């Protein structure tokens, strides 16, 4: 994939998915078939509260004035998978998710990152906790000494999910999907019911869980003031439309049995 400049529509503090730099070949090579990952997950981990409300498990992040949406989304994915694997709550490093992905991408400066860079962090390099590499108030990719040797967490990732059946099967197994797409006014709704990919800047968020209506919960990184609680919903039809987008990438993640402590239920 040619590396042109990241999208001109990228706005620090709101967006940050540098889709012009995306490497689809690496996403395919590092990812596994979704059905295989699902089987391994079901065979390895016990079932905790798989109907948990996302806001009861996660802390909604605010990326502030950085184009770090991908790193914020990846950190949420790790928190979800950690909960599913152990029944416990933990916060993972947004800085590691963003700055290490940028390093892999070859992007310098606060210009966003790619899902392929994030996938490399999740499956190859490893992630650390937020307490090991705290999120700074302004762009600062320098890794602190406290993060040295702390990248002990990894995940399994799928190849890009390209059809609605695969997406729903993943979500209905209570597993998260990191998404990257063009974000525009059709996305700034309580329920996204008429998504269009024709314009907008690159943004990355997390799909996790479905409401009784069948709508999919989307976890954003613009703080709790956005939409009143930091999350909103997408209809299945809007997700279908998103999958047709030129710049859309959906990656399913699951716990890696070799990278988490022995499962322990919440007491």
Task: List each model region and its residues.
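Acidic helix-start/capping segments at beta-turn-to-alpha-helix junctions
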Residues: 89-105
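Predominantly the structural core of cysteine protease catalytic domains
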Residues: 2-4, 8, 75-79, 103-267
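Structured alpha-helical subdomains that flank or immediately precede key functional sites
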Residues: 1-67, 71-90, 110-120, 124-130, ...
